[in-house]
């Protein structure tokens, strides 16, 4: 009787553990899909922003060149033209976001590689760090490149990163 009860109890425990493991696996698959989908959205938005950069640089240069020309004409400072052109180049470089875009793309790749199926079971801290870095780059991108055209992409990137941050807080 005790042996029979022990066998039934052992069987019930094994079944319960199998169900827990199956449930955890399904939850892990669902989390993986959400995180992967977010990386797709972020990547597409980063690529969209990158596609607008050349036009942005050109518009910025044209606008600043016009303003400088007006200043030179109105203030008769012809000897300052070369210096102003140099300042314009520095200004444009200051607002260049290619570096942030490149780093964001690198973080996306690292995130994807980290969540790829492998034997690494302790990825929560790594993902949290990557998400923090992505948020930092997105914030810098938003402060340097705030146009009406880029606003929706940057906002969407930040929302997706925040969604990922909330999820990875619970990943071990």
Feature-to-residue mapping (PLM):
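N-terminal intrinsically disordered, cationic/polar leader segments
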Residues: 1-172
């Amino acid at each position: 009787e005790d042996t029979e009860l022990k066998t039934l109890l052992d069987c019930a425990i094994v079944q319960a553990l199998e169900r827990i493991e199956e449930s955890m696996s399904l939850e892990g698959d669902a989390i993986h899909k959400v995180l992967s989908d977010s990386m797709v959205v972020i990547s597409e938005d980063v690529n969209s922003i990158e596609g607008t950069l050349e036009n942005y640089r050109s518009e910025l240069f044209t606008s600043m060149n016009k303003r400088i020309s007006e200043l030179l004409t109105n203030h008769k400072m012809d000897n300052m033209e070369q210096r102003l052109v140099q300042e314009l180049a520095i200004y444009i470089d200051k607002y260049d976001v290619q570096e942030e875009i490149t780093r964001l793309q690198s973080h996306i790749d690292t995130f994807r590689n980290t969540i790829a199926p492998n034997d690494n079971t302790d990825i929560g801290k790594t993902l949290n760090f990557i998400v923090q870095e992505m948020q930092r780059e997105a914030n810098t991108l938003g402060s340097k490149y705030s146009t009406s055209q880029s606003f929706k992409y940057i906002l969407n990137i930040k929302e997706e990163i925040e969604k990922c941050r909330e999820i990875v807080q619970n990943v071990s």
